């Protein structure tokens, strides 16, 4: 079964029969052979965490990390495999209500319509973020993704860590003038808090609630797009500078050279540091954030029955029970 999955992955992850596609297939097969001990251990861990049915629902995307970059351009294949395996072990063992496997699955974590019509916070794992994290926290306005943060969880030296691999705004299919108008209106609705900043605060709340000890965000120089896998020119097309975004939100250097450390504490300004004419707005903003935090904490682990499941996730609890005992906790990134 495991060998069949690996063979299938070569044809699925690198489709087509052009010279380039055949070359990519050969490169992937070579990487699989080189990393076979680590890949074999990885698939055993994934099967123990998810069960055979769960692993089938997840698909073969996870095997692709033996070849392509993941979260950071600096990570080698063994580290990439380790983090993916740890992510699913953590969720399956500790937070099964947040375990998303299929690319069409999503969880509505928090309705924000009382603050801005049609807005909500949604957790999902769309295919285009497959190299930047296993989960994506999004701010939606109706069906439009206004802002997204892709991340993975893993356990390192006994502590739970969260690694952010991407931050994204409204897609390029929406013209810039319309996008700016949406951002402007939402910033007004959120009491002067930009949509991306609201999303970062929501992710920090999620991290605190799950017991995350360290929150890391990939540096701009180490974004996965800058890996040689994509060629020499791909990195030149990137618009947003991640370093600027993270530093605006209190980031500092971390013990991982390719990641910043973000503070877990919620942002809060002392009243004496706020101009008098803006204090009322900041008080309303704090009420908004407190409401969002309370809503998130109410539906995160311990209250899984409150989560609104979408797509075809099915009954996570039943599937986990059928998969056997929970896997042991394994340290990553040693």
Where are these regions (language model features)?
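Conserved acetyl-CoA-binding loop-helix of GNAT-fold acetyltransferases
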Residues: 191-204
């Amino acid at each position: 079964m495991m060998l069949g999955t690996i063979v299938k992955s070569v044809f699925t992850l690198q489709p087509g029969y052009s010279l380039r596609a055949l070359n990519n297939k050969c490169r992937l097969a070579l990487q699989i052979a080189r990393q076979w001990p680590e890949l074999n251990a990885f698939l055993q861990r994934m099967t123990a965490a998810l069960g055979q049915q769960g692993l089938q629902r997840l698909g073969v995307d996870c095997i692709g990390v033996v070849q392509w970059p993941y979260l950071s351009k600096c990570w080698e294949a063994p580290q990439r495999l380790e983090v993916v395996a740890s992510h699913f072990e953590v969720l399956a063992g500790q937070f099964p209500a947040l375990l998303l496997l299929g690319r069409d699955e999503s969880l509505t974590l928090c309705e924000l319509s009382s603050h801005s019509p049609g807005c909500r916070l949604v957790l999902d794992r769309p295919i285009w973020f497959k190299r930047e994290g296993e989960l994506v926290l999004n701010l939606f306005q109706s069906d439009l993704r206004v802002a997204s943060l892709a991340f993975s969880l893993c356990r390192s030296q006994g502590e739970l860590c969260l690694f952010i691999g991407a931050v994204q705004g409204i897609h390029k299919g929406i013209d810039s003038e319309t996008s700016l108008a949406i951002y402007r209106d939402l910033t007004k609705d959120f009491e002067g808090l930009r949509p991306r900043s609201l999303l970062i605060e929501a992710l920090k709340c999620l991290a605190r609630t799950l017991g995350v000890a360290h929150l890391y965000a990939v540096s701009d120089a180490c974004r996965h797009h800058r890996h040689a896998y994509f060629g020499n020119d791909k990195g030149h097309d990137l618009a947003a500078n991640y370093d600027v975004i993270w530093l605006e939100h209190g980031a500092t250097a971390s013990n991982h050279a390719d990641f910043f450390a973000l503070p877990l504490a919620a942002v809060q300004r002392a009243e004496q540091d706020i101009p008098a004419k803006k204090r009322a707005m900041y008080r309303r903003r704090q009420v908004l954030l407190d409401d969002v935090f309370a809503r998130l904490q109410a539906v995160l682990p311990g209250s899984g029955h409150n989560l609104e499941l979408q797509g075809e996730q099915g009954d996570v609890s039943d599937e986990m029970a059928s998969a056997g005992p929970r896997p042991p906790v394994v340290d990553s990134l040693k």
